[in-house]
């Protein structure tokens, strides 16, 4: 039973990444090592973020939720956008190729570093726990989030981007950076359960993805 539960969680967490890699055409471009390089960049960026947070934003131990402190901590996620831009700038090819390489490498590195050990240790436990299913579903939401963020970075860094599109792209980037903070604050204020919070995050990420996709299609069509 424990191995079956672990297998379900593992498949739910990792197979969408594998399917994305195969169906996006990255395997035809031999982009595996490009994704690995993106993952290494992810590790470097996260190390810099942790050092920055540990230095300037020590852990809040009070009983009251620190909105300003959490907002400032969320601002550090801008480093992820800088890292994604660095990865895409080092890869030659079409826009969609750069976006998928950066997003898939980034999201896979996060999946391995933040969810691999908890799944291996926890999902193989004697007692069944829904939180590991939730963790696996959340990894798929993270994949969509990083694809969206990569597309936004790609659009804003185009030198020929029409000025009419720039405010919309900047707004979507702002929402991507502070989405986690807004969701955490909303969950804290409304005292939402774990499944409700996961559903809310999936809905918000989906709406952000659809908005970014519509803008991406408009940008590509205008510049084609």
Curated annotation (Swiss-Prot):
The cellular location(s) given in this protein's UniProt record come to: Endoplasmic reticulum membrane; Nucleus membrane; Cell membrane
Disulfide pattern: none
The record places the following residue ranges in the Lumenal compartment, namely: 59-66, 125-129, 188-194
Q: Which residues lie on this side of the membrane: Cytoplasmic?
A: 22-34, 89-98, 156-164, 217-224
Q: Which domain of life is it from?
A: Eukaryota
One GO molecular function term? ribosome binding
Alphabetized, the UniProt keywords read:
Cell membrane, Endoplasmic reticulum, Membrane, Nucleus, Transmembrane, Transmembrane helix
Q: Does the keyword Ribonucleoprotein feature in the UniProt annotation?
A: no
Q: Where are the transmembrane segments?
A: 1-21, 35-58, 67-88, 99-124, 130-155, 165-187, 195-216
* Membrane topology (UniProt): Multi-pass membrane protein
Name the major location: endoplasmic reticulum
Q: Name one Pfam family in it.
A: DUF2053
Q: Is DNA-binding one of the keywords?
A: no
Its BP terms in the Gene Ontology are: multi-pass transmembrane protein insertion into ER membrane; protein localization to nuclear inner membrane
A GO CC annotation recorded here is:
protein-containing complex
Q: What does this protein do?
A: Component of the multi-pass translocon (MPT) complex that mediates insertion of multi-pass membrane proteins into the lipid bilayer of membranes. The MPT complex takes over after the SEC61 complex: following membrane insertion of the first few transmembrane segments of proteins by the SEC61 complex, the MPT complex occludes the lateral gate of the SEC61 complex to promote insertion of subsequent transmembrane regions. Also acts as a negative regulator of CHRM3 function, most likely by interfering with its trafficking to the cell membrane.
Please describe the quaternary structure of this protein. Component of the back of Sec61 (BOS) complex, composed of NCLN/Nicalin, NOMO (NOMO1, NOMO2 or NOMO3) and TMEM147. The BOS complex is part of the multi-pass translocon (MPT) complex, composed of three subcomplexes, the GEL complex (composed of RAB5IF/OPTI and TMCO1), the BOS complex (composed of NCLN/Nicalin, NOMO and TMEM147) and the PAT complex (composed of WDR83OS/Asterix and CCDC47). The MPT complex associates with the SEC61 complex. Interacts with CHRM3, CHRM1 and AVPR2. Interacts with LBR; promoting LBR localization to the nucleus inner membrane. Interacts with DHCR7.
> Into which family does the record put it?
Belongs to the TMEM147 family.
Q: What is this protein called?
A: BOS complex subunit TMEM147
Organism (species): Rattus norvegicus (Rat)
Organism lineage string? Eukaryota, Metazoa, Chordata, Craniata, Vertebrata
- Source gene? Tmem147
